[in-house]
Amino acid sequence: MTTPSKSPAENFRPANKRGAARLAAVQALYQMDVAGTGLLETTAEYEAFRLGKEIDGDLYREADAQWFRAILSGVIENQTFIDPVIRQSLTEDWPLSRLDSTLRAILRAGVYELSKRSDVPVPVVVSEYIDIAKAFYGEEEEPKLVNAVLDRVARRMRGEGKGKDPS
């Protein structure tokens, strides 16, 4: 696996406020995982200092703060459900702990939306999180992994996806 880019904002220009909220949620989940910060502290920091702000010369697009909060709190509240879903969608010899923190954050946010936000179409969720993976990793293997995992989850959860359900 490759090392994620330090500045995904350079590579990712979301077309809408929800796309910006998804990217910010992935970044916040990463921060919480690596730094051990809590949900309330991280949410407050992002809303006050990051969403729609300029940081180190990068202008972060204005994000839908409500969508950001929903993804972030939804992942945290449902992580005991989400992580096994991701694990089941990986190959047998690939434990969740083997994924780097950025990739785990992307998959957790995507699985949250697929499992708990049926109002969002599957192609939108999958496409948005593939784009986020590309912002961090370029055209490496990680965006393909995000596509495969989210497609498997979509077929299992919603009966939708690109491939045929193997069951």
UniProtKB/Swiss-Prot annotation:
GO biological process, one term: DNA-templated transcription termination
Key words, A-Z: RNA-binding, Transcription, Transcription antitermination, Transcription regulation
Pfam families: NusB
One Gene Ontology cellular component: cytosol
KW Transcription (keyword) present: yes
Family annotation (InterPro entries): NusB-like_sf (IPR035926), NusB_fam (IPR011605), NusB_RsmB_TIM44 (IPR006027)
GO MF annotation, one: RNA binding
Gene3D superfamilies: NusB-like (1.10.940.10)
Reported function: Involved in transcription antitermination. Required for transcription of ribosomal RNA (rRNA) genes. Binds specifically to the boxA antiterminator sequence of the ribosomal RNA (rrn) operons.
Entries under HAMAP family matching the protein: NusB
Family, per entry: Belongs to the NusB family.
Protein's UniProt name: Transcription antitermination protein NusB
Organism listed in the record: Chelativorans sp. (strain BNC1)
Lineage start: Bacteria, Pseudomonadati, Pseudomonadota, Alphaproteobacteria, Hyphomicrobiales
Gene name of the record: nusB
